[in-house]
Design a protein with these regions (language model features):
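Membrane-embedded alpha-helical bundles that constitute the cytochrome b-like, heme-associated redox core
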Residues: 1-117
Length: 117
């Protein structure tokens, strides 16, 4: 049986989908509706408060890393197979390299930024 890296990307795809489905909607409600409409104090998302919360806790950094990085892999997997389905089968390998390479690059950049905070 030939070895494949497909299960790794499928697991990252599903994890990114779960994060996108469970956490991103509530984050959009909080930052896009509750705080602007005065359901929370205006300084809730002030720079000083957010910076101290992120820089003071490795758990917060880990959660932010998951919420930011995993949806990149969900996007990469979905975008690659969308392009393959519309007829770009001949460059399937190139699409995989570009899409997953972009997701890996974004994940590395996210890790570097969170590490230095």
């Amino acid at each position: 049986m030939a070895k494949s890296n497909e299960p790794i990307f499928w697991s990252l795809f599903s994890a990114g989908g779960m994060v996108a489905a469970l956490f991103l909607p509530i984050l959009m409600v909080i930052t896009g509706f509750l705080i602007p409409n005065d359901f929370a104090p205006q300084d809730t998302l002030s720079y000083e408060r957010v910076y101290s919360a992120v820089s003071g806790s490795n758990i917060v950094k880990l959660v932010l890393f998951a919420v930011i990085a995993l949806p990149f892999f969900h996007w990469a997997h979905r975008f690659k197979f969308t392009l393959v389905d519309i007829g770009l089968r001949k460059i399937r390998l190139l699409l995989g390299v570009l899409c997953y390479g972009g997701a890996i690059s974004a994940t590395v950049i996210t890790a570097i930024i969170l590490w230095w905070i």
